[in-house]
């Protein structure tokens, strides 16, 4: 009986964490003090995170710090959280493309910030902040695509794993350089990479600090497709066309599908099935459902 109660409590907690907007992985009970971390990150300016929301339901999130290969400053980390919160509340949204400015994705963390945050406590605080942010990003009810142009290094490579899909241009490369910096991935990249390519391939990629060109990344299942163009504008257009095939339909249906997949990935079977039931209740008998039934009825006559 006690074992059953413990499992039920654990399940409901996981569901709450997965679906309640604004909840994070870490809190003060884990030694994480978000406001203090924000004050620290604010001391490291540079660059920006830009968000453009299109009428077709596709958002374009741009990592914009081209003088440093779009490395994340402390301020950019804060802005990323702000954009994630904005996207959580974008009810018309269906898809999202993440890219870097000036035809390169991101080189990870800004070394100026890294040098100033030299203690294990500093490292773990930033780790928890970025794990919180990228987990919320991963759970967005939007189908997300990382458009990898140029280099995705370190934390930039980790960010690509928080997206549902990855597309590369012919000349682009992904590299988890953490071992050469004397650390391991800390923005959730290891956990997500294992899910994407399996533990054996992930161990090779991480321990070898392998330079994954577009061909190799495609072969191991890291990316879905290699685009035809390396041009910044043309490759973005290609990525938009690629994404459109998965977001055709009403926002409420696309968003429910993404939430259902997140549940299947993160929850125990019983809880995932219950959540699937609840999500079905948000679309069954809705406008899109009734319209589709009416159309099918016409075809059957």
UniProtKB/Swiss-Prot annotation:
Cited PROSITE patterns: ENOYL_COA_HYDRATASE
Tagged with keyword Protease: no
Modified positions (N6-succinyllysine) in chain numbering: 211, 295
Positions carrying N6-acetyllysine: 211
Keyword Lyase: yes
Known catalytic reactions: (2S)-ethylmalonyl-CoA + H(+) = butanoyl-CoA + CO2; (S)-methylmalonyl-CoA + H(+) = propanoyl-CoA + CO2; (2R)-ethylmalonyl-CoA + H(+) = butanoyl-CoA + CO2
Cross-referenced InterPro entries: ClpP/crotonase-like_dom_sf, Enoyl-CoA_hyd/isom_CS, Enoyl-CoA_hydra/iso
An MF annotation (GO) of this entry: methyl/ethyl malonyl-CoA decarboxylase activity
GO biological process: fatty acid beta-oxidation
SUPFAM superfamilies referenced in this protein's UniProt entry, alphabetically: ClpP/crotonase
One of the record's GO cellular component terms: cytosol
Location in or out of the cell: Cytoplasm, Cytosol
Matching Gene3D superfamilies: 2-enoyl-CoA Hydratase, Chain A, domain 1 (3.90.226.10)
Job of this protein: Decarboxylates ethylmalonyl-CoA, a potentially toxic metabolite, to form butyryl-CoA, suggesting it might be involved in metabolite proofreading. Acts preferentially on (S)-ethylmalonyl-CoA but also has some activity on the (R)-isomer. Also has methylmalonyl-CoA decarboxylase activity at lower level.
Family statement: Belongs to the enoyl-CoA hydratase/isomerase family.
Cross-referenced PANTHER family: ENOYL-COA HYDRATASE-RELATED, ETHYLMALONYL-COA DECARBOXYLASE
Protein name (Swiss-Prot/TrEMBL): Ethylmalonyl-CoA decarboxylase
Species assigned in the record: Pongo abelii (Sumatran orangutan)
């Amino acid at each position: 009986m006690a074992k059953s109660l413990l499992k039920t409590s654990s399940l409901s907690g996981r569901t709450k964490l997965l679906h309640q907007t604004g909840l994070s992985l870490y809190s003060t009970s884990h030694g994480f003090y978000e406001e203090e971390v924000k004050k620290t990150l604010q001391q490291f300016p540079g660059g920006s995170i830009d968000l453009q929301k299109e009428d077709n339901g596709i958002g374009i999130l741009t990592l914009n710090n081209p003088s440093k290969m779009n490395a994340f400053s402390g301020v950019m980390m804060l802005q990323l959280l702000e954009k994630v919160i904005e996207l959580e509340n974008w009810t018309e949204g269906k898809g999202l493309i993440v890219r870097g400015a000036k035809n390169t994705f991101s080189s990870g963390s800004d070394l100026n910030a890294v040098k100033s945050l030299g203690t294990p406590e500093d490292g773990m605080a930033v780790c928890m902040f970025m794990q919180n942010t990228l987990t919320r990003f991963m759970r967005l009810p939007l189908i997300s695509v990382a458009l990898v142009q140029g280099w995705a290094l370190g934390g930039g490579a980790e960010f690509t794993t928080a997206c549902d899909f990855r597309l590369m241009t012919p000349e682009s490369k992904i590299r988890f350089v953490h071992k050469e910096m004397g650390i391991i991935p800390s923005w959730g990249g290891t956990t997500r990479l294992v899910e994407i390519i399996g533990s054996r391939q992930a161990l090779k990629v991480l321990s070898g600090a392998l330079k994954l060109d577009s061909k190799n990344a495609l072969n191991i299942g890291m990316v879905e497709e290699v685009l035809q163009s390396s041009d910044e504008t043309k490759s973005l257009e290609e990525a938009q066309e690629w994404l459109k095939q998965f977001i055709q339909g009403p926002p409420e249906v696309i968003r429910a599908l993404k939430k259902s997949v997140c549940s299947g990935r993160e929850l125990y079977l019983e809880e995932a099935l219950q959540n699937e039931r609840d999500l079905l209740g948000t679309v069954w008998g809705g406008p899109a459902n009734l319209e589709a039934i009416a159309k099918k009825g016409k075809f059957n006559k």
